[in-house]
Structure formats: C-alpha cells, structure tokens
Amino acid sequence: AFRAAGGGTGLSMDIDEYDTMEHPYKQLIVWNPEAEEILGGYRYLLGTDVRFDEKGAPILATSHMFHFSDAFIKEYLPQTIELGRSFVTLEYQSTRAGSKGLFALDNLWDGLGALTVVMPNVKYFFGKVTMYPSYHRRGRDMILHFLKKHFYDQEKLVTPIEPLQLETSEEELNALFCKNTFKEDY
C-alpha cells in the first residue's frame, strides 16, 4: 500500500536491516480469517528491546532522522513502542472498500491498544509520519504548524536532524490557527 503512494525500498520485498538484524522489529498484523488475507499492519519495537551502538545511540529505524536526548532514552524509551511502516492494503483502503476500509484501520489501532494491555509498562508510542512528495504542501504545512503550536516538545526530547522547512507563510498559518487551544484551532 505504501509502495503505491511512493514509499518502500523499491525492491521486490520491503525488508530492510531492521527486519533482519539480530533483535529485529516485530510485526502487528490485522488478519481477515474469512478471506484469509492480511488487511494491514505495523512494524514495531519495544523500547525495552532497543539495542545501542558503540557510541551509545539507540539502533532504531528513525535514528537517521532524529536525535534522542538522554532524558528520552532514560525516562521514556523503556515505556515506549516505536512504530513504523504502517499500512492498510489497497483493497481495504476506504476509497476502495467503503466501511471495510475504516474497520481495517480501526482494527489496526485496536491492535496497538491491545499491546498496551499485554504490556502494561508501555505508556507511549513513537514513530515518524510519512508525507510523500505528492502530498499537498499547504496541507502538510498546516498539519506541521498545528502540531508545533499545540504540541511543541519543550523539553527537546526528540529533535529532527534536518527540520522540515515550511513553504506556507507563517502569517497565513497563524491566521488559520489563531485560537488558544488545540480544540478551538481544530
């Protein structure tokens, strides 16, 4: 599904070193038992399973994108699941499958919730959100501005190595999101 939107490795199978390393990421799969097919999934790694390189940096699929503070590594990572490579198969995406597509995504999120039940030490999910080049830039900028305004990481727990540059003017974004709370701005 992500390949159709411009993602993936470009190889015949989207497997990388994080799938094959000594302590690999796990897969959360949504399965349709009647049709015997996969509807969607997430790749994930428990923070308690994270290994560290010789410099003490966490070996994560997002390590090339983010700097992780010592506070994040010590206080949050042990209670975190890193998520990545989420997908809903094309046949179950809402534009093609109607309500079945919504249920596939809902079931995927239910699976994430189930992980927190079987692993009660987990309090946080972390991961990157991919917005492909085809994604409308103004829409992307609106999302990024909204998140930065209302959910800014004051402690700088996780910071981007190369911050995204907004193309939409700050004036326009401030005019769109001019309320005091995220609920009012939403």
Model-derived segments and spans:
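Short amphipathic alpha-helix that is part of the acyltransferase structural core
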Residues: 1-46
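Acyl-donor binding region in acyl/amide transferases
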Residues: 49-186
